[in-house]
Swiss-Prot record:
Gene3D superfamilies: Translation initiation factor 3 (IF-3), C-terminal domain, Translation initiation factor 3 (IF-3), N-terminal domain. InterPro entries: T_IF-3_C_sf (IPR036788), T_IF-3_N_sf (IPR036787), Translation_initiation_fac3_CS (IPR019813), Translation_initiation_fac_3 (IPR001288), Translation_initiation_fac_3_C (IPR019815), Translation_initiation_fac_3_N (IPR019814). IF-3 binds to the 30S ribosomal subunit and shifts the equilibrium between 70S ribosomes and their 50S and 30S subunits in favor of the free subunits, thus enhancing the availability of 30S subunits on which protein synthesis initiation begins. Keywords: Cytoplasm, Initiation factor, Protein biosynthesis. Belongs to the IF-3 family. It comes from Staphylococcus aureus (strain MRSA252). Its main location: cytoplasm. One of its GO terms (biological process) is ribosome disassembly. This is Translation initiation factor IF-3.
C-alpha cells in the first residue's frame, strides 16, 4: 500500500481523522465509518483509502487504487496543457520611406505570423527629422493593416510611443 504523497494527500495510515464518510470504489456512499473499519474494507479489496475532501465534517474518503488515480490526474493535466494556446507577439519593423518590394516582403512575414496564430506588432521608427511627417508613417501602417484585413483584425490603432508608431494586429478567430 502507498504512503503519503508529495502533494500531501492523506492515504491509508496517514489519515488523521477518527471518523470518515466512506465512498466505495463503485462510487456508492457507504456512510460514516471509523478509520479502522474503513482501512479494513479497503485492504479486503486490495485498494487504498484516500481522503478526497479533507475539509468536510467528517472528511470524505474513497476506496480506490491511488496509483491509478494519480496517473489519471497527471493525464488530465497534460491534456489541459495541450489545449492551452500560447500567443506570442511578433514584431515587424518598417520605415516611413519603405519601398514597395520591401513592404511586400515584410507583409508576407507578418501574414505568416498571423496564420500561425501569433499577434503581430507592426512598428515604424522615425529617425531624425522624419518625425515631423507622422502622417506618412500612419499611412504605411494603415496600408499594412488593410493588406492583412482578410486574416487579421486591428487590435490597437496606430499610436505614437516616443519616436515609434505602432499598430497591433491579432489573427481573426477561426470558425
Amino acid at each position: 500500500m502507498s504512503t503519503i504523497a508529495k502533494d500531501q494527500t492523506q492515504i491509508n495510515d496517514k489519515i488523521r481523522a477518527k471518523e470518515l464518510r466512506l465512498i466505495s470504489q463503485d462510487g456508492e456512499q457507504i456512510g460514516v465509518k471509523s478509520k479502522r473499519e474503513a482501512l479494513e474494507m479497503a485492504e479486503r479489496v486490495d485498494l487504498d483509502l484516500v481522503v478526497v475532501a479533507p475539509n468536510a465534517k467528517p472528511p470524505v474518503a474513497r476506496i480506490m487504487d491511488y496509483g491509478k488515480f494519480k496517473f489519471e490526474q497527471q493525464k488530465k493535466e497534460k491534456e489541459m496543457k495541450k489545449k492551452q494556446k500560447i500567443i506570442n507577439v511578433k514584431e515587424i519593423r518598417l520605415s516611413p520611406t519603405i519601398e514597395e518590394h520591401d513592404f511586400q516582403t515584410k507583409l508576407k512575414n507578418g501574414r505568416k505570423f498571423l496564420t500561425k496564430g501569433d499577434k503581430c506588432k507592426v512598428s515604424i521608427r522615425f529617425r531624425g527629422r522624419a518625425i515631423t511627417h507622422k502622417e506618412i508613417g500612419q499611412r504605411v501602417l494603415e496600408k499594412y493593416a488593410d493588406e492583412c484585413k482578410d486574416i487579421a483584425t486591428v487590435e490597437q490603432k496606430p499610436k505614437m510611443d516616443g519616436r515609434q508608431m505602432f499598430i497591433m494586429l491579432a489573427p481573426t478567430a477561426e470558425k
